[in-house]
């Protein structure tokens, strides 16, 4: 039969009438996402495992995680959170630290259990351990430099058992090896022997119930945790259970659990087939802690970790140009159609020689070559090193990647469109005070050096936020905040569009796509991320299963130059006497 009605809004109409629906998609609020997650990559030892990104929210926690031997990493960790003096320019608040060097922990074999330090690197080998008889059970003490910890009463009773049958003698054996894992008894003069598989009776309560079910034994749960695993019992060999009740324990597991739950320095693991608490030993040092020798493969592994994360900014604690190029390649991939996670990086090179005119000229050439080698709008090169206080409170000159840490901190504490130009840096001085011609030359070449703040007459600021891009004069590529702001807005629109993928391609859904796009633009306008936009310019074109959306907005550009002209007016006067 021919269809005589129409389908609209999910309902089929045959009777002429008016109908209505509400489209509120233009009013939908989907707040703009964050854009200030910073990842810091470099050689560092301490409590962060290698090739593991750990989120840190404040500078104090960063200091507690990074060992003092990693001086530059610790300094960078402070500068990203506090890159500028005063409160006008806040620092980062979401920072991931990712050690690239293959550092190893220190370990200590206690015979039946192995301790592994939480600390990675050579200092971990300064940890020492003592095992002795405690008030009850074992006492394990740990010392590191001037700090120590002790854990007493490491023992655990699990269940008691007494043979009550007619046999003249009875013994019990608990075999904890992986091959057997059984509780067995040997009875003289009666057929009351037990042969219980601990894989079957895998809790203390289940084991006690199975023993009591024979009617030939009296067993009781002693532990406060009846669901404790029987696989963690201590070994027992031909123990008399006829003349007196015997209490089986889990003392080894008590020692393991005690270390794992209480120690700030070690984790513990029982060894395969071990079945007794560790023997007493005098103070013994752990061994094997190493800082590791970092290779480019280690750096690549760290960048691969970042591929699984949503980060926006990257700081590389390295002066190696090959590492800078690897980081830029990572940013390029992740900012592309496959990565779909836009990000940019900050780098700095080694200290240069500025002692004489020839050396200065060579240093300028070297910095210009570094920018030319990168030639990327995703990398900002700080150029010059800076003076900071060292751990002893004395001024020390550090490489340019420490200056880059301040750049990264300022960016991570600001909106995506905030220019870094003329932002004040927290430093005592610079590697050199560039001449005006040198500064201009470096900026033209794609280096963003700091220079003295001539406006305030003190301190140091970012000269101009140029990237290392040298291919054209497009501000999207040249000015860090312009490119970052545009990338941010495009990512926010894309994320809203992702919500529509898989929906039916109705005209109403097409209107929703347009409304969502304009909603993001309006939110960006309200937040000051764009200067203006025209919602009527947002266009959608349908091609089968494809939706092409075109939209436009005026980006926020930095104010780089203000040229003023003072027009002098002639003085005229009429004097009457």
Task: Report each predicted region and the residues it spans.
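Short acidic low-complexity segments
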Residues: 28-29
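C-terminal edge-of-domain segments
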Residues: 541-577
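A glycine- and small-residue-enriched flexible loop/hinge signal that marks low-structured segments
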Residues: 2-18, 22, 32-120, 124-178, ...
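Serine/threonine-rich, repeat-prone extracellular segments and beta-strand-based repeat modules
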Residues: 535-541
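Short, contiguous acidic and Ser/Thr-rich linear segments
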Residues: 193-199
